[in-house]
């Protein structure tokens, strides 16, 4: 089980990403638009740098919804591999069966 502080930090990052997503996209569009003047693009780049670091989606980490485990997390379920195994054996994930051949 991950520390609660780490899990809360990830939740805070997710909120920041959602909060600044529209502004971030608008600024990135200005920076990448070649028809804009150099000064406008430079100002947009400076403004983009002023956004909080944690507003960048690449700083987010996928974590297990139950344990908070950062590694071995399946995006489809939002769970770590060991929790998927436990829940699947109990039959709580519809359509998921153990492989046999």
UniProtKB/Swiss-Prot annotation:
Keywords: Ribonucleoprotein, Ribosomal protein, RNA-binding, rRNA-binding. GO terms for cellular component: cytoplasm; small ribosomal subunit. GO terms for biological process: translation. One of its GO terms (molecular function) is structural constituent of ribosome. Signal peptide: none annotated. The keyword RNA-binding applies. It comes from the Bacteria. Pfam families: Ribosomal_S14 (PF00253). Belongs to the universal ribosomal protein uS14 family. Binds 16S rRNA, required for the assembly of 30S particles and may also be responsible for determining the conformation of the 16S rRNA at the A site. Part of the 30S ribosomal subunit. Contacts proteins S3 and S10. This is Small ribosomal subunit protein uS14. It comes from Burkholderia cenocepacia (strain HI2424).
